[in-house]
């Protein structure tokens, strides 16, 4: 069940030498915070990212173990080298935590550099990896910034809150307001400062609440999504736990998006029909003097208002958009990882996407917290060519819908013109515009009423088309599919000529995410509404 869910990832940074007498207070403070988060998000699995260094790191890992929070270890170097930093009394604690960890991620050294040449750089890389891939950074810190090293706790807090450090290997911290630091006051050994274990939230707490709420909402709904689904990749690749997790969440997001898309389109259809019914019944009430039509008009209007209110309360439109955005971002990430690329989608999301859907940005960060891909595989058939064919066929389907809508609008226009000139001819021949009509008819007002009703019906039909097909953004979608089909065709040709380069894969991923963001931007303008 948890495979389909986005984990709430708690990153750890802290001092190597907290005061021994504060150990119990600090451990209790960490356990309280973890328990509070679990209570706040009961459907969301929690994972701790921790380097397991002596001092605060090991203390937090042990607190997490006591409250049942999973652990992913992030080591700055190979375990055998890392263990040299540990005193004998802490070495057993380290090895036990590594044994219970879900996974052990070793941050690779800078290309061409020996692992022991710049240990501070390696520790900084591990700290920044944790910072980037966490929803919340839990900092056991004394709050002091002077005389701090580049890889120390203060530097990591600064990176989390201001994005102050640009890590190596292309890692980049995201927008500062999308990451919150929970500061646990932690005096160092030899300090006389009071207040050990005092909690303080640094960063945008309102933004954190939004991210937690959206993540919890998705995970609760993911429990109702069907299990499994057709894999995008060969079955043999399921051994990669990061890819397996990403694909499971992607399938849940895709299933939920389709569910809410059906609800959204059904709502749009109902509102279009009811809006048309309101206009038509009022027209008959007004022109045909059918008094009872006003009752049908009121019933249709009430039903439309109830439908609109229900759609807004269910939030189906937003969920449809955001879950599709999540599914698309994960699909792109899945192909990148399969290809052996180290590009992570959260690093290339557009600024607009980061602002509008910070919870998706955080989800991608959490789901990319794993070992770097080791194998390089050909993705031309399973990604490039399949996506080209998808956009080609989707463009054709959208063009078909657009042509049907255009034909109906054209027909409505012709009918309106014919009825308009028919009305002029009627008035010229039957008495409205001529003092001595050549073709006087009896009951002229009845015929005039019928003509008005016919003209009004054509207008009502046009209103229906605008209320339903107009919300589908067919022309925009058709253009987007054409552009993306051309992109995949061009990239496929370049891969044939130059090979599957990292630059081409990143370009492709960036363009797909940009298209995803563009789609969400204009789709947000198509929220359900009642047009009368």
Predicted regions and their residues:
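Acidic/glycine-enriched connector segments
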Residues: 1-194
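Conserved non-transmembrane functional hotspots
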Residues: 200-414, 421-532
């Amino acid at each position: 069940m948890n495979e389909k869910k986005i984990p709430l990832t708690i990153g750890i940074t802290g001092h190597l030498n907290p005061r021994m007498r504060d150990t119990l207070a600090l451990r209790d403070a960490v356990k309280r915070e973890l328990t509070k988060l679990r209570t706040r998000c009961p459907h969301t699995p929690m994972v701790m990212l921790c380097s397991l260094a002596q001092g605060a790191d090991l203390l937090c890992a042990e607190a997490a173990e006591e409250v049942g929070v999973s652990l992913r270890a992030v080591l700055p170097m190979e375990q055998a080298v890392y263990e040299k930093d540990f005193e004998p009394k802490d070495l057993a604690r380290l090895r036990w935590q590594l044994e219970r960890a879900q996974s052990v991620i070793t941050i690779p050294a800078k290309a061409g550099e020996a692992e022991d040449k710049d240990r501070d750089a390696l520790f900084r890389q591990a700290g920044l990896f944790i910072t980037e891939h966490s929803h919340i950074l839990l900092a056991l810190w004394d709050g002091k910034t002077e005389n701090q090293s580049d890889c120390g706790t203060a530097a990591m807090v600064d990176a989390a809150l201001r994005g102050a450090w640009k890590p190596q290997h292309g890692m980049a911290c995201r927008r500062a307001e999308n990451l919150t630091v929970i500061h646990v006051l932690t005096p160092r050994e030899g300090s006389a400062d009071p207040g050990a274990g005092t909690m303080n939230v640094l960063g945008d707490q309102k933004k954190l609440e939004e991210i937690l709420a959206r993540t919890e909402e998705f995970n609760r709904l993911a429990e109702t999504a069907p299990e499994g689904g057709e894999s995008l990749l060969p079955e043999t690749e399921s051994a990669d736990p990061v890819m397996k997790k990403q694909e499971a969440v992607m399938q849940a997001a895709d299933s939920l998006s389709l569910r809410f898309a059906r609800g959204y389109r059904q709502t749009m259809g109902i509102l279009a029909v009811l809006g048309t019914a309101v206009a038509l019944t009022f027209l008959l009430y007004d022109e045909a003097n059918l008094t009872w039509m006003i009752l049908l008009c009121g019933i249709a209007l009430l039903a439309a208002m109830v439908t609109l209110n229900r759609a807004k309360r269910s939030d189906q439109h937003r969920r449809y958009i955001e879950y599709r955005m999540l599914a698309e971002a994960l699909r792109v990430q899945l192909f990148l990882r399969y290809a052996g690329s180290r590009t992570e989608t959260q690093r290339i999301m557009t600024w607009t996407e980061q602002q509008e859907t910070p919870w998706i940005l955080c989800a991608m960060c959490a789901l990319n917290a794993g070992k770097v891909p080791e194998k390089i595989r050909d993705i031309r058939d399973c990604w490039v060519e399949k996506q080209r064919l998808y956009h080609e066929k989707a463009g054709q389907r959208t063009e078909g819908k657009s042509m049907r809508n255009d034909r109906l609008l054209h027909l409505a226009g012709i009918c309106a013109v014919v009825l308009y000139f028919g009305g002029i001819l009627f008035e010229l021949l039957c008495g409205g515009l001529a003092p001595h009509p050549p073709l006087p008819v009896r009951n002229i007002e009845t015929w005039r009423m019928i003509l008005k009703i016919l003209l009004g019906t054509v207008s009502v039909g046009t209103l229906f088309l605008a209320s339903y097909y107009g919300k589908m953004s067919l022309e925009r979608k058709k253009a987007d599919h054409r552009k993306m089909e051309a992109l995949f065709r061009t990239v496929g040709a370049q891969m044939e000529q130059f090979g599957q380069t990292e630059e081409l894969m990143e370009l492709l991923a960036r363009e797909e995410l940009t298209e995803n963001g563009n789609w969400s931007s204009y789709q947000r303008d198509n929220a359900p509404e009642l047009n009368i």
